[in-house]
Amino acid sequence: MYDQVPYRDTDEATPQIKNDASDSNRSSIDTTSTTSLILERLHREDPDDSPGEYESSGPSQRGKPDEDDDLEIGRAARLKPMERKVRRAMYLLAFLMIGGWFLALAVYVSREHFGTPDTAHDPSATATRKAGKKITLNQVMRGAWRSKTHGIQWINGPHGDQDGLLLTQNSFGDGNFLEVQDVKNDSNTIVLIKDGALQGSGQPVSAIKGWPSSDLKKVLVASDHEKRWRHSYNARYWIYDVEKATTEPLVPSEPEARLSLATWSPKGDAIAFVKDNNVFIRQLGLDLTSEYYSVTQVTKDGGPDLFYGIPDWVYEEEVFSGNSALWWSQDGEFLAFLRTNETEVPEYPIQYFVSRPSGNNPPNGLENYPELEFIKYPKAGAPNPVVHLRFYDLKKKEDFAVTVENDFPDDDRLITEVVWSDGKYLLVRETNRESDVLRMVLIDVSARSGKVVREVDISAIDGGWFEVSKNTRYIPADPASGRPYEGYIDTVIHEGYDHLGYFTPLDNKDPILLTKGQWEVVDAPSAVDLKNGIVYFVATEKSPIERHVYSVKLDGSNFRPVTSTSEDGRYDVSFSKLSGYALLTYEGPGIPWQKVVGTPSGDQSFVKDIEKNQGLATLAAKHELPTFHYSTVNIDGFDLHVVERRPPHFNKKRKYPVLFQVYGGPGSQQVSKSFSIDFQAYIAAGLEYIVVTVDGRGTGFIGRKARVAVRGNLGYWEAHDQIETAKIWGKKGYVDKKRIAIWGWSYGGFMTLKTLEQDAGRTFSYGMAVAPVTDWRFYDSIYTERYMHTPQHNQEGYRNATISDTQALSKSVRFLLMHGVADDNVHMQNSLALLDKLDLASVENYDVHVFPDSDHSIYFHNANRMVYDRLEQWLIRAFNGEFLKLDGLKPIREISEPLRKRNRELV
């Protein structure tokens, strides 16, 4: 139905090894191939009769007589004799070629090191020419190919007027534990904590993390970290006095207390913390008779079902991507915090068969039973946690709520962002449960009132949704600089693309448009220079698969690139507090690097190298790396980006197997011009398979029209785009269209199964799905309903998105399913439900591997290495045709007896 698809292949290549003008140092692969051709000519009747690697696995693949593949007879018994002189000449030539091959091999082996190119990485080359070491899976798994990056935390000086200060934390034995560096002058370094091995309350304290107060006189220190969920943890907290070099517990009355969160006030005179799901505040420097009374308990009814100041599981995973749900006002006089009531949220049991994450010993007689952890997990359509915003007035010592006019009902409200102004106002971003109606709420904490100042129904505009955003930037009033009113910068939709809008005053619903065009801003804005009225941001203006830094004035004028767009590049950036400096991270396509640079807001001539990744460059120079070829495919009018990873010494005359790697989640992106030697690169370079990734409809940065097309019917268009792209690749002369596979993890696992189901064996022969969603009714409500609505509003869509067509799955040659038993994100229930469907339908063309006590990342007890070992070995078996032999298996006796009978007849 979809065989004829328009295709635009720019064949833009980004290889990992520089081209060499000479072929004299090529791998012995080419010579071996030449020798094999000569020997094959001596014993071949028809050049086209020799089967390829895949076809040789069985006579049914070619329709030839059974004798063609008989291991004891072979075709040689029926070949015609050659003329004697010709045969002698051919043998002589063959022996000369073999001798030359052995001589070349001896020279190659005797060399002290592998041939290397002139540079480690040349994005302009199109093929690997020189020989080098092979990439190994061990290298990839231990992180040898990961670039080094340094996360810099920019901070203000003690008085807030010093720019270019950064906070650096080092590992034990690697310099000062915590220090403040001046990027302009290394001699101005301020050592906050010299050694992370501290003493507190007469006991040793091993610091794992430190946060200085704004005046740099004290440091909040965490120790004894215990992981909770993906982003959260419990720890013991301490206050370190920099001048006195003393350490005291944050909670004086409970030095052993484990807290879920602790954070400084902006002025450094108080710390808010969460213990047992309640909010507390410790005020410092008070003239009190007892340190104990400096701690105020703000809330008192927190417990297993009621959270204050920290998110529950679903808000941590899908909204805040962190462990904090409290926000200090900029003057430190108010504290806003989230109240989360999950009383009505159903529980899901997580089973641990090997370990006991709770740390508790089981009761006598129950040692052999698994440990159960019950998590409040709202699945699609189930009751959500009910959230409210509450406030604490530190001067009046009052805890209060604010009534918002025209607010969402409790069961239809998501609070996704809170931003304080300079004064007593704050902005609250809310959406309805299905994330397609946005309301920006302005709250006056002095008047204790709130109102909706902006409402957008995106479902009426393009049928799409709002993603969770945490990049709203408050802009204070400054009449002298042309800003008479307060305002904020937010992402807005303009002509089908995400852009920046400046809303001023705070209650204005019509923005000043700062950017526009058929491209999108990314997590913007990155910084705002208030003194000069400059907004900095990252965007895709040059290409959806690149990232460059740009700037624009607050009035929308003077749009310009900050990084050079004359060359391909993917950049990330973080700015100093006054925007005069930036940590610029170049992620590829060449060897990544990091520099601190001066910005247009400061001294643009300033450059300081932070990381050159010289070790990675040396490693790349010694290895044969795949080449990366970027192109687009046009499917149903959408230009979709593709990256093809080709093996070193790619030969277009060969027939290569192809592996498609997929994620495909809404708003995601896999195809990008970044340096990445990962599992996919290993498959291409180490196993010499082609690996293709295509970002289909639903993915990000190609406009909302392509993105929102998947709403309400996840999997259909995404799988369609994978299949159509695979058909295009199957027509390429260097691709073996009978050996095409697909694999993915999480949403990519769902995409793998959905693609196999929709394709029904016509294009993809194999698939490997790790931790897949198989029924969206099993996944969490906030994520799922954003893209699918609720099951109550979209029953047919949920049925269509479920992996349920077992007969279609049975038409692929074989697929692999893997899952962590203790997955708290994509529950094992997904894979078990699919296995039950396969059992009922008597479908058996699959393999399964489960990992006890592993969560969604699958790490417990060497599990992560096992995942990739299994993927590699299973893929080799698939492309070697081994799974084709599993169909119609017979006992060895039934096979060997006809062979013996036939051999007797030939004697």
Curated annotation (Swiss-Prot):
<feature type="active site" description="Charge relay system">
    <location>
        <position position="823"/>
    </location>
</feature>
<dbReference type="GO" id="GO:0004177">
    <property type="term" value="F:aminopeptidase activity"/>
</dbReference>
<comment type="similarity">
    <text>Belongs to the peptidase S9B family.</text>
</comment>
<dbReference type="GO" id="GO:0008239">
    <property type="term" value="F:dipeptidyl-peptidase activity"/>
</dbReference>
<dbReference type="Pfam" id="PF00930">
    <property type="entry name" value="DPPIV_N"/>
</dbReference>
<comment type="function">
    <text>Type IV dipeptidyl-peptidase which removes N-terminal dipeptides sequentially from polypeptides having unsubstituted N-termini provided that the penultimate residue is proline.</text>
</comment>
<dbReference type="InterPro" id="IPR029058">
    <property type="entry name" value="AB_hydrolase_fold"/>
</dbReference>
<feature type="topological domain" description="Vacuolar">
    <location>
        <begin position="110"/>
        <end position="907"/>
    </location>
</feature>
<dbReference type="InterPro" id="IPR050278">
    <property type="entry name" value="Serine_Prot_S9B/DPPIV"/>
</dbReference>
<keyword id="KW-0325">Glycoprotein</keyword>
<dbReference type="GO" id="GO:0005886">
    <property type="term" value="C:plasma membrane"/>
</dbReference>
<dbReference type="InterPro" id="IPR001375">
    <property type="entry name" value="Peptidase_S9_cat"/>
</dbReference>
<keyword id="KW-0472">Membrane</keyword>
<keyword id="KW-0720">Serine protease</keyword>
<feature type="topological domain" description="Cytoplasmic">
    <location>
        <begin position="1"/>
        <end position="88"/>
    </location>
</feature>
<dbReference type="GO" id="GO:0000329">
    <property type="term" value="C:fungal-type vacuole membrane"/>
</dbReference>
<feature type="glycosylation site" description="N-linked (GlcNAc...) asparagine">
    <location>
        <position position="185"/>
    </location>
</feature>
<keyword id="KW-0031">Aminopeptidase</keyword>
<dbReference type="InterPro" id="IPR002469">
    <property type="entry name" value="Peptidase_S9B_N"/>
</dbReference>
<protein>
    <recommendedName>
        <fullName>Probable dipeptidyl-aminopeptidase B</fullName>
        <ecNumber>3.4.14.5</ecNumber>
    </recommendedName>
</protein>
<keyword id="KW-0735">Signal-anchor</keyword>
<keyword id="KW-0926">Vacuole</keyword>
<dbReference type="GO" id="GO:0008236">
    <property type="term" value="F:serine-type peptidase activity"/>
</dbReference>
<feature type="active site" description="Charge relay system">
    <location>
        <position position="746"/>
    </location>
</feature>
<feature type="glycosylation site" description="N-linked (GlcNAc...) asparagine">
    <location>
        <position position="341"/>
    </location>
</feature>
<feature type="compositionally biased region" description="Basic and acidic residues">
    <location>
        <begin position="1"/>
        <end position="11"/>
    </location>
</feature>
<feature type="transmembrane region" description="Helical; Signal-anchor for type II membrane protein">
    <location>
        <begin position="89"/>
        <end position="109"/>
    </location>
</feature>
<feature type="active site" description="Charge relay system">
    <location>
        <position position="856"/>
    </location>
</feature>
<feature type="compositionally biased region" description="Low complexity">
    <location>
        <begin position="22"/>
        <end position="36"/>
    </location>
</feature>
<keyword id="KW-0645">Protease</keyword>
<keyword id="KW-0812">Transmembrane</keyword>
<feature type="glycosylation site" description="N-linked (GlcNAc...) asparagine">
    <location>
        <position position="800"/>
    </location>
</feature>
<feature type="region of interest" description="Disordered">
    <location>
        <begin position="1"/>
        <end position="71"/>
    </location>
</feature>
<keyword id="KW-0378">Hydrolase</keyword>
<dbReference type="Pfam" id="PF00326">
    <property type="entry name" value="Peptidase_S9"/>
</dbReference>
<dbReference type="GO" id="GO:0006508">
    <property type="term" value="P:proteolysis"/>
</dbReference>
<keyword id="KW-1133">Transmembrane helix</keyword>
